[in-house]
């Protein structure tokens, strides 16, 4: 008997239910997402892995409400902390992106304004909707006053400032000067927390003056500024060298705990998933074919596509050339019938082209969409 792998309840910050999406193009309609289902728990670092063009980034854009004009969601729901974001009005979605959802993209230079300093761009976040950030900014400064960095007792000379801030917090009101001062203090502390050297200097710099790794750290700091419920990280280490890549990944993992956010990490690299994720979903041609805890997936992959992906990863302990998956990724304008992987699957049989397999639970927190396991 088939079983949904999403779990209703208070532990899920994100729940996607039977999401179908297509793109209208001159060549025809592209069936980009074919009824995907997944859930992410509060505080979880969840990996979404698959080949290029399988629908990973489209999933993130649908969650964030950033789809291009030629995209159409034909069915399904996306719940963020119990609220269906697909039903939100444009202004409500903008506020959700400002406070509840943050997204980090592959190329930070594309999304950073080249003519504004880093500090100006970070300040824009709070200026867009200052009432959303008063509590965060004031509480940050109060913590600085009460717990000095050098470990000394609080400066008695700051007591008046503390009283004024406490009043501002109670009344939810800050003047422009106070807002700018608190924003700068908070932004610099975030730049420091993402381990940027000389954060005060970086605050005054322009994006072109920073390296690729430094720009990506700035993007993470800007995302943290919102203290989002859900952080979407789309191929954020692809353009970075291996050393910087490892630093960014461990930074993301540490900060996830610090700001108590859930993270959807999108990647084509299984090694990244193994390094930092708690659970992972494997995606193929607009379908999720397997979901499991990371250790379980690497120890006991079940779907033929998952097995093929793992077999194609180069390994230092094997002298032979890694295996490749036969065939090519299907054209999603006219995708294969039934299971979309069946034309490339070494285990395919007569049922596979006739209908789409259901996602079933085959073990604790391990789900697979394949007729080999009764789907």
Could you describe each region identified by the protein language model?
Residues 49-50:
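The feature captures the beta-strand-to-loop junction immediately N-terminal to the Walker
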Residues 11-12, 291-375:
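Short catalytic/signature loops enriched in Gly
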Residues 73-84, 138-139, 188:
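Conserved ABC transporter NBD signature motif
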Residues 206-210:
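Conserved ABC ATPase signature
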Residues 9-13, 22-35, 66-72, 89-92, ...:
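A short, flexible loop at the N-terminus of ABC-type nucleotide-binding domains that lies
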Residues 119, 228-320:
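P-loop NTP-binding/switch modules centered on Walker-like glycine-rich loops
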Residues 85-102, 120, 128, 180, ...:
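ABC ATPase NBD coupling module
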């Amino acid at each position: 008997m088939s079983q949904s792998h999403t779990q209703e309840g208070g532990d899920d910050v994100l729940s996607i239910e039977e999401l179908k999406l297509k793109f209208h193009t001159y060549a025809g309609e592209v069936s980009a997402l074919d009824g995907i289902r997944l859930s992410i728990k509060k505080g979880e670092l969840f990996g979404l892995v698959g080949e290029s063009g399988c629908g990973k980034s489209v999933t993130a854009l649908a969650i964030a409400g950033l789809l291009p004009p030629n995209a159409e969601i034909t069915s399904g729901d996306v719940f963020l902390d119990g609220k269906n974001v697909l039903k939100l009005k444009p202004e409500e979605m903008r506020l959700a992106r400002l406070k509840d959802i943050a997204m980090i993209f592959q190329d930070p230079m594309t999304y950073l304004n080249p003519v504004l300093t880093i500090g100006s761009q970070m300040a824009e976040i709070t200026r867009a909707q200052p009432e959303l950030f008063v509590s965060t900014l004031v509480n940050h400064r109060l913590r600085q006053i009460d717990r000095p960095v050098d470990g000394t007792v609080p400066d008695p000379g700051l007591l008046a400032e503390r009283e004024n801030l406490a009043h501002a917090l109670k009344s939810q009101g800050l003047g422009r000067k106070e807002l700018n001062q608190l924003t700068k203090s908070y932004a610099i502390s975030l730049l420091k927390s993402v381990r940027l050297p000389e954060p005060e200097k970086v605050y005054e710099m322009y994006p072109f003056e920073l390296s690729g790794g430094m720009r990506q750290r700035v993007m993470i700091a800007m995302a943290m500024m919102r203290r989002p419920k859900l952080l979407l990280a789309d191929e954020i280490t692809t353009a970075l060298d291996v050393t910087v890549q490892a630093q960014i990944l461990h930074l993301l993992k540490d900060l996830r705990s610090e700001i108590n956010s859930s993270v959807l990490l999108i990647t084509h690299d299984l090694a990244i998933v193994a390094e930092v994720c708690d659970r992972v979903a494997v995606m193929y041609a607009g379908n999720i074919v397997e979901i499991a805890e990371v250790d379980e997936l690497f120890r006991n992959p079940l779907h033929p596509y998952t097995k093929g992906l793992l077999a194609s990863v180069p390994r230092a302990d094997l002298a032979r050339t890694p295996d490749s998956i036969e065939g090519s990724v299907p054209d999603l304008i006219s995708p294969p019938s039934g299971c979309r992987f069946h034309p490339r699957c070494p285990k395919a049989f007569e049922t596979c082209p006739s209908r789409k397999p259901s996602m079933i639970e085959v073990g604790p927190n391990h789900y697979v969409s394949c007729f080999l396991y009764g789907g």
